């Protein structure tokens, strides 16, 4: 039997079981847990390689082979870190396993044929496209920024650069909802829109859901009163949608305890749980300890650095239409910015107590930095807290799975769309992101939407090959013509689909049905279901989890930063 050195094998086919990779310039290392390919029967495309007629490529017709195969991919997902081939058929993941020609190769479960395109996954890390659940739809260009960061699904609300949208993720009422659905239909990214949930009677909520809202947002700027919360959750239970809440910073309609009482035992998604983004001051962070609350962070406070506090005041004044000349407005802003709770947020993420990461796009958060900041936090926590339980000195697999779940599967579960997106699993949309390990989490090598390339770094168009400088991200064919409709999905409530909204508005994108939002809890948050008892000192803002103070130093230096953005 012929042999090949481990180094030569990795260079040719990518890492295999037991090999380790460093993620970007962090101190995080993954180790390959399993290899689904067959040694000696790997498929690879190119001159003198395997995927040729009668060798790795079979003779079958279109219906019997996959449309796209990603060869020798290193999959990083909440369920594992494995080496495999990925087959794509009709825009969805057909299989994860061994690709090739079953006529001449053993163990083939993904058939490569004349109709199959090849994406070279050798040496690449593949993740599911990110799901950002806190989008202020201030400008349509956010879609490009999100896609080029590795995010493929936007959930939020708004109507453009107006006061209501600058402050809240709300698309209010039937007319606004329909116009925005018509607008986002043209974007090459998956979209779901929130209606306004700040209503104390049910009729105005039902009509928004029937008009196309995939969920409702309660926000203090519109009134996050106990009556509105109670009513909104009643309608959510009735119509199977999720409720997102930015609670009452000023405690005008009630304190934290009144909000928890209004919520009862019903599930709700709490945004920026730390509080700098808004919510009961100073104790909204206690919601991390509630079994029916799905806690999330937005990225402006993540991770805690020496600059975090200083930049927040001005951002907050702009986003919430506050006047720096009015003392009460300044006091409102200052009440939300607390070093102690910001520091505790990092630790709660590392413990798996905060389940979701999101952006708060152009409304204090940065739409293109959800993934970067997630991994910066993971790195900071490894350096400050050491090896996570379940990990060892050789790999950080458990920590890596915990953090990738925060922006992929958990937000998808929270909003009833995990049957379509959020992980690299059979049957789901082939929204996949390929990374060179050195650029992991920072700059994708390819962003695929429903199996077709949507964005990629591309060199001089007049060059003889694709790579000469200047290289920058450009939209690819999934963003053009009718293909963009087949490559993206609009998420709608079941009620709006039954009411015929896609047909009435002539929506051309794929339609995804929101379901299963009301029978979940914190326990449903994969790798991030820890529910500690949170104590907060209202005078010093000290945070304790199960009696242990949560204290960490601000970072003075971060990975995945300036060295990646010189050009």
From Swiss-Prot:
Catalysed conversion reaction: urea + 2 H2O + H(+) = hydrogencarbonate + 2 NH4(+)
Residue ranges annotated for the Urease domain, each copy included: 129-567
Domain of life, per lineage: Bacteria
Keyword Signal: no
Pathway: Nitrogen metabolism; urea degradation; CO(2) and NH(3) from urea (urease route): step 1/1
Binding site for Ni(2+) 1: 134, 136, 217, 360
EC number, UniProt record: 3.5.1.5
Binding positions (Ni(2+) 2): 217, 246, 272
Cofactor(s) for this UniProt protein: Ni cation
Processing after translation: Carboxylation allows a single lysine to coordinate two nickel ions.
Modified residues (N6-carboxylysine): 217
Entry GO CC: cytoplasm
UniProt signal peptide: none
SUPFAM superfamilies cross-referenced by the UniProt entry: Composite domain of metallo-dependent hydrolases, Metallo-dependent hydrolases
Molecular function GO labels: nickel cation binding; urease activity
Disulphide connectivity of cysteines: none
Binding sites annotated in the UniProt record for substrate: 219
Active site: 320 (proton donor)
HAMAP family: Urease_alpha
The name this protein goes by in its record: Urease subunit alpha
């Amino acid at each position: 039997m012929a042999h090949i050195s481990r180094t030569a094998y990795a260079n040719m086919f990518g890492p295999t079981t037991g090999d380790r990779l460093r993620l970007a310039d962090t101190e995080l290392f993954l180790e390959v847990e399993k290899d689904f390919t067959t040694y000696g029967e790997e498929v690879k495309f190119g001159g003198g390689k395997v995927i040729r007629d009668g060798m790795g490529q079979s003779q079958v017709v279109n219906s019997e082979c996959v449309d796209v195969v990603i060869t020798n991919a290193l999959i990083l997902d909440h369920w594992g870190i494995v080496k495999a081939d990925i087959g794509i058929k009709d825009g969805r993941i057909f299989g994860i396993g061994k690709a090739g020609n079953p006529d001449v190769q053993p163990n083939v479960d993904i058939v490569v044929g004349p109709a199959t395109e090849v994406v070279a996954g050798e040496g690449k890390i593949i993740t599911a496209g990110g799901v950002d659940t806190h989008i202020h739809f201030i400008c349509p260009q956010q879609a490009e920024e999100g896609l080029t960061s590795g995010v493929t699904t936007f959930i939020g609300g708004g109507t453009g650069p107006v006061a209501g949208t600058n402050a809240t993720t709300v698309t209010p009422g039937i007319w606004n909802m329909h116009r925005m659905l018509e607008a986002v239909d043209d974007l090459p990214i998956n979209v779901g829109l929130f209606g306004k949930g700040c209503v104390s009677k049910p009729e105005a909520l039902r009509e928004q859901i029937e008009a196309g809202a995939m969920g409702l947002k309660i926000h203090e700027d519109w009134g996050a009163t106990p009556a509105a919360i109670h009513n909104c959750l009643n309608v959510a239970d009735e119509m199977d949608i999720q409720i997102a809440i930015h609670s009452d910073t000023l405690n005008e309609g009630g304190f934290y305890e009144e909000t928890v009482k209004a919520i009862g035992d019903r599930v709700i998604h709490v945004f920026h749980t730390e509080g700098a983004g808004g919510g009961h001051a100073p104790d909204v962070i206690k919601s991390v300890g509630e079994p029916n609350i799905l806690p999330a962070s937005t990225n402006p406070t993540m991770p805690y650095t020496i600059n975090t506090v200083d930049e927040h005041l001005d951002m907050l004044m702009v986003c919430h239409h506050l006047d720096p000349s009015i003392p009460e407005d300044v006091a409102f802003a200052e009440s939300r910015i607390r070093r102690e709770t910001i520091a505790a947020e990092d630790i709660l993420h590392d413990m798996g107590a905060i389940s979701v990461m999101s952006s708060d796009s152009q409304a204090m958060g940065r739409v293109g930095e959800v993934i970067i900041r997630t991994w910066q936090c993971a790195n900071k926590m490894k350096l400050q807290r050491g090896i996570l339980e379940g990990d060892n000195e050789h790999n950080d697999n458990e920590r890596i799975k915990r953090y990738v779940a925060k922006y992929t599967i958990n937000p998808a579960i929270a909003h009833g769309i995990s049957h379509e997106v959020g992980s690299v699993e059979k049957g789901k949309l082939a929204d996949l992101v390929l990374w060179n390990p050195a650029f992991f989490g920072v700059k994708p090598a390819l962003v695929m939407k429903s199996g077709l390339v949507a964005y990629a770094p591309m060199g001089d168009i007049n060059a003889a090959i694709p790579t000469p400088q200047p290289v920058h991200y450009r939209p690819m064919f999934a963003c053009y013509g009718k293909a963009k409709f087949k490559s993206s999905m609009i998420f709608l409530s079941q009620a709006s689909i039954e009411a015929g909204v896609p047909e009435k508005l002539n929506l051309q994108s794929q339609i995804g049905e929101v379901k299963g939002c009301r029978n979940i809890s914190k326990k449903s948050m994969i790798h991030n279901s820890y529910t500690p008892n949170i104590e907060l000192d209202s005078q010093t803002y000290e945070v304790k989890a199960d009696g242990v103070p949560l204290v960490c130093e601000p970072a003075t230096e971060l990975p995945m930063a300036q060295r990646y953005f010189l050009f």
